[in-house]
A protein has these predicted regions:
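ATP-binding/phosphotransfer module of carbohydrate and carboxylate kinases, centering on a glycine-rich
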Residues: 304, 308-323, 332-350, 380-383
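Nucleotide/phosphate-binding catalytic cleft detector across ATP-hydrolyzing
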Residues: 1-18, 22-206, 223-224, 234, ...
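Glycine-rich beta-strand-to-loop/alpha-helix junction loops that act as flexible
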Residues: 80-85, 321-331
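A cytosolic small-molecule/anion-sensing beta-strand core signal
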Residues: 220
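A structural feature that tracks compact, well-ordered secondary-structure segments
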Residues: 215-217
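Amphipathic, non-transmembrane alpha-helical scaffold segments
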Residues: 292-299, 303
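Catalytic-loop motifs flanking and including active-site residues across diverse enzymes
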Residues: 233, 237, 331, 366-372
Length: 409
């Protein structure tokens, strides 16, 4: 007999290298308690995009089976993420007249609708409309509902993605007998699990380095200002090792994970690494410092492209909290140090937060997306609870706009 839970939420991260399913229970105080976890190799994606539906479905099913067994439950709905070089981010602005000189939730919904009324091509899908600021009669405000005014403006960040990429993710999930409760942008999910409110307020750039893509999200004033997806990440580091050392790709991945270092000056020149040969060629030994010499140029290229994306945001000079690295490829020694050399800002490695009795498996940077998906689910539950308590009066306008948007699109 399946175990009974009061309120389960499920995060599904369909990555280029792995599929991760995490099941958690939202407890009475609004905290998350881990209930189940499943991880399986992923073989149906390339650079974050589904390229083989059958292989992706099999990977999801394998991770799902593990998670359901551990949680002793049947999963029906999931929060899942999306990334890829097809992702486009932009800022927009809308303005409406306030009907009764006092801003209502309807006015907020109208101004956000005006701000999101941009022209997008038929092959693109709206993925995110996130409010940045509201302005009443020229005055910036955080919470406009209830305030007096004649003109209400909204500044929002909009993200679109390829319609087919989103449809293929949803198709894979549905073929596993699941429904997508929400499709969330991967870097936004990661930011929910690894960034603090203070960092977002003071200015921070999140850099999620996975296997297929490097996702960037820039925050200032507590709001998202810029998003970018760079199609260069851990897989190309592995490819560089395989080609430079003439070793099979699987062995190159193992060498990267076990002995890799992103900064050559930090690598031990006396430490030797065994490099298997191709075909019937025997293995040979290589110093860890020489290995780092292969890795560093690619990591430097990734960080240079990230730096360019941050410059494009127009926020580089006000990122007081610096850079936060997360994702599976961020754990390599030397990443933080090389990042500080290139960004000339403080850099830290971001670990997922927000769950009591956090398992070691989900407290690592590679779990940033899936834990962020759970945090988004938790926040949705908390918002819904507050709405019911207030008899429909929404206390926080950001949550209200998000709930309104999800309900209409």
């Amino acid at each position: 007999m399946a175990k009974e839970y009061k309120d389960l939420v499920v995060g599904l991260d369909i990555g280029t290298h792995k599929v991760m399913v995490v099941v958690a229970e939202v407890q009475a105080g609004g905290t998350l308690k881990l209930a189940g976890l499943g991880i399986a190799p992923s073989s149906g994606l390339k650079r974050g995009v589904v390229v083989n539906i059958d292989a992706t479905v099999q990977s999801i099913q394998a991770a799902l089976k593990e998670a359901e067994f551990m949680a002793d439950c049947k999963i029906g709905r999931v929060y899942t993420g999306i990334t890829g070089s097809h992702i486009r981010g932009m800022n927009s602005h809308g303005m409406v007249a306030v009907k009764d000189r006092e801003v209502t939730a309807t006015d907020v919904a109208r101004v956000v609708e005006t701000a999101r009324a941009i022209t997008i091509s038929n092959d693109q899908r709206l993925l995110l409309v996130e409010p940045q600021e509201f302005v009443i009669d020229g005055q910036d405000v955080k919470e406009p509902i209830g305030m007096s005014g004649i003109r209400l403006e909204a500044k929002v960040h909009i993200v679109t993605g390829a319609q087919t990429a989103a449809e293929n993710i949803i198709k894979c999930v549905r073929r596993c007998g699941l429904e997508v409760e929400q499709l969330l942008l991967n870097p936004l999910a990661s930011s929910l699990s690894v960034l603090t409110a203070d960092e977002k307020e003071l200015g921070v750039a999140l850099v999620d380095i996975g296997a297929g893509t490097t996702d960037v999200a820039v925050f200032t004033g507590g709001a998202i200002r810029h998003t970018a997806v760079i199609p260069i990440a851990g897989d190309l580091i592995t490819s560089d090792i395989a080609m430079a050392l003439r070793t099979p790709t699987k062995d190159a991945e193992d060498i990267k994970v076990e002995s890799g270092c992103a900064k050559q000056l930090l690598a031990d020149p006396d430490m030797q690494v065994e490099v298997p040969g191709l075909g019937d060629r025997g293995p040979r030994m290589l110093s860890r410092q020489a290995l780092a010499g292969v890795i560093e140029p690619r990591v430097e290229e990734i960080f240079t492209l990230v730096h360019q994306a941050i410059r494009e945001s127009g926020c580089e000079e006000i990122l007081s909290s610096g850079i936060v690295l997360t994702g599976g490829s961020s754990v390599m020694p030397g990443m933080v140090e090389l990042g500080e050399d290139i960004f000339l800002k403080p850099v830290r490695r971001g670990m997922p937060q927000h769950m009591s009795a956090l398992s070691d498996l989900v407290s690592q940077p590679r779990a940033a997306v899936v834990m962020g998906l759970l945090e988004e689910a938790r926040l949705g539950r908390v918002r819904g609870h507050k709405v019911s308590q207030k008899h429909g009066k929404v206390k926080n306008v950001w949550g209200h706009v998000k709930d309104w948007f999800l309900g209409n699109f």
